[in-house]
UniProtKB/Swiss-Prot annotation:
Organism the protein comes from: Synechococcus sp. (strain JA-3-3Ab) (Cyanobacteria bacterium Yellowstone A-Prime)
Described purpose of this protein according to its UniProt entry: Regulates the transcription of the pyrimidine nucleotide (pyr) operon in response to exogenous pyrimidines. Also displays a weak uracil phosphoribosyltransferase activity which is not physiologically significant.
Lineage: Bacteria, Bacillati, Cyanobacteriota, Cyanophyceae, Synechococcales
Listed Pfam families: Pribosyltran
Record's keyword terms, sorted: Glycosyltransferase, Transcription, Transcription regulation, Transferase
Matching InterPro entries: PRibTrfase_dom, PRTase-like, PyrR, PyrR_bifunctional
Protein name: Bifunctional protein PyrR
HAMAP family: PyrR (MF_01219)
GO terms, molecular function: uracil phosphoribosyltransferase activity
Source species, domain of life: Bacteria
């Protein structure tokens, strides 16, 4: 059983460039676009997408940070959770929103994010951008923008490491049994 590096820093940058290009092409009115990163790793990805869009397409979209702590359906497991604050640049009514996250797996995080968004207005449209889509959905949720679709077994773990949160850049595919043994 092993840990495999799926993407390195350069490859992650290329995935982000492709995502930024696709988002900018679909949103010609960048002044109405709001990129909302889902805490934790969706936030630095949203800022990176903003910077890439600004560099390649002129006007930078606004960025927000969404905390979904109290909207998750697994609040009872894992002990007490401390919420962060959501920080959104404006009322989302009539805006084009792109939710940004690192990994899409079962769809529970995105479901919670959609529920949390209801407290900030009624966007014209909400789309989803993820760095990695690993499949195995429990909800009918699909990304509109996907950096890479990675085939995994349900028991495997995909970990995205970003310099802003982890001090390094890489995407790892980890065997779950190996991860469990390292926790004992």
């Amino acid at each position: 059983m092993s840990t495999v590096e799926v993407f390195n820093a350069q490859q992650i940058a290329e995935l982000i460039d492709a995502l930024a290009t696709a988002i900018a092409r679909d949103h010609p009115h960048l002044d109405r676009l709001v990129l909302i990163g889902i805490r934790t790793r969706g936030v630095p990805l949203a800022y990176r997408l903003r910077d890439r869009i600004a560099t390649g397409f002129g006007s930078p979209p606004q960025v927000g940070e969404l905390d979904i702590t109290f909207f998750r359906d697994d609040l009872g497991s894992g002990g007490l959770r401390t919420p962060n604050r959501s920080e959104l640049p404006r009322d989302l009514t009539g805006q084009e929103v792109v939710l940004v996250d690192d990994v899409l797996f079962r769809g529970r995080t995105v479901r919670a994010a959609l529920e949390a968004l209801n407290h900030f207005g009624r966007p014209e449209q909400v789309r989803l951008a993820v760095l990695i889509d690993r499949g195995h959905r429990q909800f009918p949720i699909q990304p509109d923008y996907c950096g890479h679709k990675l085939t995994t077994a349900p028991e495997q773990i995909v970990k995205v490491h970003l310099r802003e949160t982890d001090g390094e850049e890489r995407v790892l595919l980890i065997d779950a049994k190996l991860e469990e043994n390292s926790r004992e």
